Structures are given as structure tokens and as C-alpha cells.
A protein has these predicted regions:
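Charged, low-complexity intrinsically disordered terminal segments
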Residues: 1-362
Length: 362
């Protein structure tokens, strides 16, 4: 198995674009968000240029409701001319792919009154010729391309076929959870129905078994993952949490600035730009990465990819290059949220979780 970490769009996209353009048999692309800006147009151009006879695109219905990190149905968004122009460009991009003979499907409709909005298909995948697959956190939009993020490039036929089968099940409207074990690498897909059980089987035991240290970088870390990290710290494990200084989700920002919620953890704020990277390093031996944000919604409702990597060379690369850059670009949290703000954030997130479970089941 050949594994490679690609940090940020500047490393990921040139490699993925070259693979797409060289494809001979098929290209499968799955994303939460595809927008009609330079990033989305670059993907569309590469797909149209590919000689592969089979080219398919899966987009979550998120893109029908949120563009450029803006909720499209708010009064301000409805009156925003440039935003509406980007919405039209996004629709034109999708229509252009269809006209080029590239089937496009939207997954996970949000339903009446957007009641199913928490249940997104959050997976990101580029797969070429049952030979190469990319998975991780990067969506196809300019603002996502500007964020700190990470993709895992996997060059292995069995891994590619496994991820292709998962893609095609979802494309046909029949997603299901699945797993593949390879030397130094486990791949797991989550279907949004059995997530809690699978996280408890696959990820939580790694956190619970940590002996010395855990480093986690995540934009939207919440319970139950946060609570397990606090328990690890109570056992004497050194736990470092990297999260964005300027977070586009206010409740999470206030939760992670709350000393009660993060007791025993070293919280560091990544400066200068959003970090959308999601990874956990346990005892400098096991690396967990993929699309999951380690939050309420990934735990219960969202389609996700999870890779558990024990390949020593890749783990060293993550620690020396990716983690080191995150630590160097961050500062310790020095101004905690007030007790009432932290308590309100915790209560609000609990309420959102319970309401979502009531509506969606679970």
C-alpha cells in the first residue's frame, strides 16, 4: 500500500488533477460542496478533459442550501447579488457536467423545512481507475481550497475498489457501512445510521487505550469525542487540541474556550486562516483521519470516511510535517470563555443533538 499525505489544496489538487486527466477507465468524485468558482471549475475542466469512459460525480444536497459558507435562504443572502451570481454559476457548472455526459447525483435531501439537514453525506473522494484514491477533508470551493486541510492519497487496487464500491452504492441510493483491513491501513465507511456503534468500536478504544499523548486537530470538536479526551487527560495522558482561532461555528468556539468542558486539555488556536483539518494522533503510533469532524453530527448522522493508519513512515510524516506546522501556526488559549458562555454553548449543543435525534431517529 502506497500512502501519502497531501497538506492543503496546493499539494492535493495538482496531484488529483493530473490523475484525473490521465484516467483511462473511470473517475469517481464525491464531495459535500461543489461551487461554481475557480476550484469547482478546475474540477469540471479536468473531468471534461479526462478520456475515462466512466465519470461520475456525487454532491451532497448541502450545496443546494449553502454556497460560499452562506445559508442561501436567509433574507440577506436572497438580496446579495454576488452570492446569487455564484449560485447561478454553480447550477451552470452542474448542468455543464451533465451535458458533457458526466452523471451528477445529489445525495441526502434536506427534506421539508430542512429537518434532515443534520444528516449530510460528508465524504470527500477522488478515485481514478481503481488504482488511486484520495480521501479527507477538502471540498471543491475556493474558500475550502484556502483553508488548512489534509487529504490521504492511497495507491492500492483493493483499497480503490473498496472505495469505488462504497461510492457506487451511494450513487444508487443504497449506502451502507463497510470496512477493509490492509497492512498498516484500515478503511471504514459510515452510512449515517450505524455511526455511533462504529465510532464506539473503532475510534473510542484507541482514545481510551492511549498511554502517553494524544494530539487532535479538528474544526468542530464536540461531545462525545471531547468528553473521552477529557477522560484520557484525567488518566494522565497529555492531550493537545488544535482548533481554529476564528471558527465559523460560534457555539464550538465558545465550547472549546470553556475550562469546564476542556478541563485537563491543552487547547491551541490556529491563527491566520481556518483549519478544516481532522486528524487524531495517538501515542505517535496510530493516526486517524478522514472526513469526520469528531462532532455530534459525524457521531450520529453523517456519511463519513475514516482511515486508521499504523504505517510508521506515514505517521512520522504527519508528526514532523503536518502536526508540526499546526503547532507552529497556533497559540495557547489564554482568554477562556466566561462560565455562563461556556455553559450556554454546552447546553445549546446538547439541545441541538437531542432535537436532531428526535427528528432523525437514534
Amino acid at each position: 500500500v502506497r500512502l501519502e499525505l497531501l497538506q492543503d489544496a496546493r499539494e492535493f489538487w495538482p496531484r488529483a488533477e493530473a490523475d484525473i486527466r490521465r484516467a483511462e477507465r473511470r473517475v469517481l468524485v464525491q464531495t459535500l460542496s461543489l461551487e461554481g468558482d475557480q476550484a469547482g471549475q478546475a474540477l469540471a475542466s479536468a473531468l471534461r478533459a479526462s478520456r475515462a469512459p466512466e465519470r461520475r460525480v456525487l454532491i451532497d444536497s448541502f450545496t443546494r442550501h449553502v454556497v460560499n459558507d452562506r445559508f442561501l435562504h436567509s433574507p440577506a443572502s436572497l438580496l446579495d447579488g454576488p452570492l446569487r451570481a455564484e449560485v447561478r454559476a454553480t447550477r451552470a457548472l452542474v448542468a455543464g457536467l451533465s451535458r458533457a455526459g458526466i452523471p451528477v447525483r445529489f445525495t441526502s435531501p434536506a427534506g421539508p423545512l430542512l429537518l434532515r439537514f443534520p444528516a449530510r453525506d460528508h465524504r470527500k473522494l477522488v478515485l481514478v481507475d481503481d488504482r488511486v484514491a484520495y480521501l479527507g477533508g477538502i471540498n471543491f470551493s475556493e474558500h475550502n481550497f484556502a483553508w488548512r486541510d489534509l487529504m490521504l492519497r492511497i495507491e492500492h487496487e483493493r483499497a480503490a475498489r473498496f472505495l469505488a464500491a462504497d461510492f457506487l452504492r451511494t450513487f444508487r441510493g443504497r449506502p451502507r457501512a463497510s470496512s477493509l483491513a490492509l497492512p498498516g491501513l484500515e478503511l471504514h465507511t459510515f452510512d449515517g445510521r450505524s455511526n455511533a456503534r462504529r465510532f464506539e468500536q473503532l475510534l473510542m478504544p484507541l482514545v481510551d487505550a492511549a498511554r502517553a499523548r494524544i494530539e487532535i486537530e479538528a474544526p468542530y470538536l464536540t461531545q462525545p469525542f471531547l468528553e473521552r479526551l477529557v477522560r484520557a487527560a484525567e488518566r494522565g495522558v497529555a492531550v493537545t487540541v488544535l482548533t481554529p482561532e476564528v471558527n465559523n461555528f460560534r457555539l464550538v468556539r465558545e465550547l472549546l474556550a470553556c475550562p469546564v468542558a476542556t478541563r485537563g486539555l491543552s487547547v491551541r488556536l490556529y491563527r491566520g486562516r481556518m483549519t478544516h483539518l481532522k486528524a487524531i494522533l495517538v501515542d505517535a503510533r496510530t493516526l486517524v483521519l478522514g472526513s469526520a469532524n469528531f462532532d455530534i453530527w459525524s457521531y450520529h448522522f453523517q456519511g463519513e470516511h475514516l482511515a486508521i493508519v499504523r504505517d510508521a513512515e506515514l505517521v512520522r510524516d504527519f508528526e514532523s510535517r503536518v502536526l508540526a506546522a499546526g503547532l507552529a501556526g497556533s497559540r495557547p488559549l489564554t482568554r477562556p470563555a466566561s462560565a455562563w458562555r461556556g455553559a450556554l454553548a454546552r447546553l445549546s449543543l446538547r439541545s441541538l443533538e437531542r432535537a436532531s435525534l428526535f427528528v432523525l431517529g437514534g
